[in-house]
């Protein structure tokens, strides 16, 4: 019984030693506060990953399906600063786009941005009807051309913002419609594979 009480007391004391750290989004997402995390040592905050939605950052309720992942890379005092690690669309949102008699076209592309960041970008488009394999290939080729071109032209921050805000997907939809009417195009996932040496 005494041992159990000691364990409870020790746990309480350990919790008392913990401090709350404020987590901030990367500067190119406005550097806004995105959460709090407890730790008894600032080193334990390093590399923690926080998931937020684009709605949390912008206040735009139509962006609740866009999930963003930020990783802590620096701690100063009670402030924890993050870098972008990836994004993905909520599964429920993707399911809502794919209906009977539609065609989902997926593309996965490994790219390097103008400033040397390596990313895996997953795009998708939804055609209004069942389409031919040749049309799928043509739309996938459009995805590839647009995403590769953007990677050559844009630095990491601008590429991520254009992807997250739907600008790249809008270009894919516009060009893809020349092959077949599309219900929607989306960048559904981004993963950071590597950073330039000096980053």
Curated annotation (Swiss-Prot):
One of its GO terms (molecular function) is structural constituent of ribosome. SMART domains: Ribosomal_S3Ae. Belongs to the eukaryotic ribosomal protein eS1 family. This is Small ribosomal subunit protein eS1. It comes from the Archaea. It comes from Pyrococcus horikoshii (strain ATCC 700860 / DSM 12428 / JCM 9974 / NBRC 100139 / OT-3). GO terms for cellular component: ribonucleoprotein complex; ribosome. One of its GO terms (biological process) is translation. Keywords: Ribonucleoprotein, Ribosomal protein. InterPro entries: Ribosomal_eS1 (IPR001593), Ribosomal_eS1_arc (IPR030838), Ribosomal_eS1_CS (IPR018281).
């Amino acid at each position: 019984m005494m041992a159990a009480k000691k364990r409870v007391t020790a746990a309480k004391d350990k919790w008392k030693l913990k401090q709350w750290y404020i987590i901030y989004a990367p500067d190119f997402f406005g550097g806004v506060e995105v959460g709090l995390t407890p730790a008894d040592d600032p080193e334990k905050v390093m590399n923690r990953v926080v998931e937020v939605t684009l709605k949390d950052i912008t206040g735009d309720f139509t962006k609740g399906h866009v999930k963003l992942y930020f990783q802590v890379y620096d701690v100063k005092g009670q402030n924890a600063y993050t870098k972008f690690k990836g994004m993905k669309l909520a599964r429920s949102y993707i399911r809502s786009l794919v209906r009977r008699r539609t065609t989902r076209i997926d593309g996965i592309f490994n790219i390097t941005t103008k400033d040397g960041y390596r990313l895996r970008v997953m795009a998708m488009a939804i055609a209004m009807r069942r389409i031919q394999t040749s049309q799928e290939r043509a739309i996938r080729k459009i995805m590839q051309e647009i995403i590769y071109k953007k990677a050559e032209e844009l630095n990491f921050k601008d590429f991520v913002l254009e992807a997250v805000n739907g600008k790249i997907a809008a270009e894919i939809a516009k060009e893809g419609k020349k092959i077949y009417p599309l219900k929607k195009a989306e960048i559904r996932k981004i993963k950071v594979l590597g950073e330039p040496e000096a980053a």
